Amino acid sequence: MNKQTLSFQAEVQQLLHLVTHSLYSNKEIFLRELISNASDACDKLRFEALNDAALYEDASTLEVRVSFDKEARTITIADNGIGMSADEVIANLGTIAKSGTREFVGKLSGEQAKDAQLIGQFGVGFYSGYIVADRITVESRRAGLKAEEGVRWSSAGTGDFEVENLVRAQRGTSVTLHLRDGEDEFLSAWKLKSVIGRYSDHISLPILMRGQVWDAEKSEYVTQDAWETVNKAAALWARPKSEITDAEYKSFYEQFSHDSTPPLAYTHNRVEGRSEYIQLLYLPAKAPHDLWNRDRQGGIKLYVKRVFIMDDAQALMPSYLRFVKGVIDSSDLPLNVSRELLQESRDVKAIREGSTKRVLGMLEEMAGSEDAARRDQYAAFWREFGAVLKEGVGEDHANRERLAKLLRFASTQADEGVSLADYLARMKDGQEAIYYITADTTAAARHSPQLEVFRKKGIEVLLLTDRVDEWMLSHLFEFEGKPLQSVAKGAVDLGKLQDEGEKQQAEAAAEAFKPVLEKLKDTLKERAKDVRVTTRLVDSPACLVVEDGDISGHLARLLKQAGQSAPTSLPILEVNTEHALVKRLDGSERFDDLAQVLFDQAVLAEGGQLDDPAAYVQRVNRLLV
């Protein structure tokens, strides 16, 4: 192939501009990203060589080499991994549709620390080289191809790049950065070693640099020909826990997760028995941008006997714990394990169950800690990941009780952080149920008319506003013997909390209101399944409820927003016979208008939308004149 000049994908040009102008204060990350890419390339070779050992050619020892040239003002990161063909170079470096560039660009915040973290998460770390370089040259040959099939790629990171054939004896890839003016600090072995130590010390491959000795005559260090390893080059998780410091655990997390925020907690265990494996699992402090994508790439890397197998080992962690990051290294799985085999393996099932228990144990330790700081950490975790953890209540029957104890809610007595155990401890004498209401927002829930009698009697009600709540509650019926009861479903029955005088008064009011009630039922027969007198209202004239077996208006709206069809069932209108508006109904010449407005206001009060807002406005106008 003769030299070709090709144009970058438009989004890549935008990305390059942002990288060079937005991440300057975090410029050290370029070395982390390029070493990480080199390590990945070696992992891929090791994996492909399981089925074709000839890919190793004459070099089975995998390594990453970092070098610099003061005269030429270049830094080179080279690996002897899988390498790339000419087509792969063009696809991977010129167009990066697979890397989610558009989404990456949309997520850039202008905060340099956050943006530096994102660049690795979105798989566009190669381009971080342009933070310090005004030109990058890549030379590569894919393992298994002839020496004549090497390729050179070069670009100044502007609008286009050049590609040409190259005779390259060694497989793998070298990335050479031609430094910008003012970046000479990186032309130093001490500087490069310090960056490698900070970000890449736990890369499981050796990272080599040329040795240096002090030259007394020149009063400077002189580079030697011999190469020496500058990182620990050992899998952190395989080392004894007693030899690993907290700082090393956190450094490893930052290196493999591309997350600069320290994790909330981690657990490191060697499991022996029916299945033997090592697990090193972390709870991140911040939710990823695609947390709600259940098909998102997971955070668990699978190794078998220290050999990297796959990045996204979803079968090793349930979907509701998809935010967990870490490494699982099995001694039992075959090296050629496939994703399909992972779904069926008994060993994988044992690893999944064991890992789930470890993660829940970390959460329980934080949530139940006597240390207020640890409990605050759990509160922070819940704000980031609580809604996803709720999925487990319906998906993980074996751990449902443990998950129920970890749930946290807002309530009429607290803005957040109320556990079901907290609620039970505050229940009124004679209270027989745990009461809750679902709504789109906490404010809407807090001001819902269905809460009025509960507020009057000082009964706490949980305020549920996550989209997953209704689904979760279809699987969680009780907690420690107390049923969970929606205040917007069925007839209100406060049992022993309602005295006999109140009950008799309500029955008498209902009897006196019967003629008006029948007329209301007839007027609203197309909109309401029933109309009845209620004791749940104190200040509001009316509210909507549904039968115990029907879906709530809130859930019906969520299904509609998701483009799904909801079962059609009419709500029940409950009226407060003590309210002036309801009293006006009796004998009113505008009965129909009043009845319809009463229903419309109840719809609005529960967060619903009117089918015909114009008709509502016309009725209100007629009643006002």
Curated annotation (Swiss-Prot):
GO cellular component, one term: cytoplasm
Single GO MF descriptor: ATP binding
Alphabetical list of CDD domains matching this protein: HATPase_Hsp90-like
Region of interest (B), residue spans: 340-557
Annotated region described as C, given as residue ranges: 558-625
Keyword Nucleotide-binding part of the UniProt annotation: yes
Principal subcellular localisation of the protein: cytoplasm
Subcellular location(s) of the protein: Cytoplasm
Keyword Nucleotide-binding (UniProt): yes
Annotated keywords: ATP-binding, Chaperone, Cytoplasm, Nucleotide-binding, Stress response
Family matches, as Pfam families: HATPase_c_3 (PF13589), HSP90 (PF00183)
Domain of life: Bacteria
Record region (A): 1-339
Family: Belongs to the heat shock protein 90 family.
Summary of subunit composition and partner proteins: Homodimer.
Function description: Molecular chaperone. Has ATPase activity.
NCBIfam families recorded: PRK05218.1
Protein known as: Chaperone protein HtpG
Protein species of origin: Methylibium petroleiphilum (strain ATCC BAA-1232 / LMG 22953 / PM1)
Organism placement in taxonomy: Bacteria, Pseudomonadati, Pseudomonadota, Betaproteobacteria, Burkholderiales
Gene name of this polypeptide: htpG
